[in-house]
Amino acid sequence: DLASNKIMTEFTERYNERIYVAKVFSQFRGYRALVVVERNRKNLLEVSFPSVAGHLRFVDLMKALGLASDHDIVEAVSTDEEILTFMMQNLEESECDSVESGIMYVGKKLAPNQTRDYQKKRAEFVLDNYLLPHLNYLMPANLKEGDPGYRAAVDSVRLAKAHFLGRMAESCFDLVLNRRRIDDKDHYANKRLKLAGDLMEDLFRISLNRLTRDIKYQLERASMRHRDLSIATAVRADVLTERLLHPLATGNWVGGRTGVSQLLDRVDH
């Protein structure tokens, strides 16, 4: 696999024009999200990540994450004069002037034709869960919504995400200015080898999630039919077992990975 949580740069061709791209595979607790910052044909920065159809304007997304002023956004990217020139063009194209308007811009992209309250909640949920999820480790584990300090913790994580996006934008501009080369995806420094422990961790997580969904389905079906709820009938033993044994036997692991090329004979001699 490509290294997680590491900024990588590359070129792409679109409509016979070169697009400069900085991307990162952000991974946290088994969830892996591709976040891309690119400089489009109009020389404007755009961001894409899971759950968002299309692209979001970079500056407006930064405002949604808590950087309200243009000065703060520029500081998060770079103080270099050449990069500042590029950033001025992005600032002029921005349509948001506050954190609230930035969140509503994201919400309208995610849930068009919905109520403002729903759009705001949806935008905050996506920003907190799908944008750069590896930075969510900064959030205290036992802190819940409504607890003292929860709002401050959420805001600090969003600011961390904004500054990480700033680093990605700087990498993109450095590529434009020939200050850095594109990253070699085949170089060993950009690769990570998943061994048995990592594969088993991913496999067990997915298998357990499937088991819990199956238990929920069995209990809901029994409840609808007014039957007595029984753990023996709700928990099917083969769901977890078969899900674990099949990849071990065939080598077809989760995520399309392949390993062992033949069936293993499990005879204990």
Model-based region annotation:
Residues 1-268:
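N-terminal non-catalytic structural scaffold regions of very large proteins
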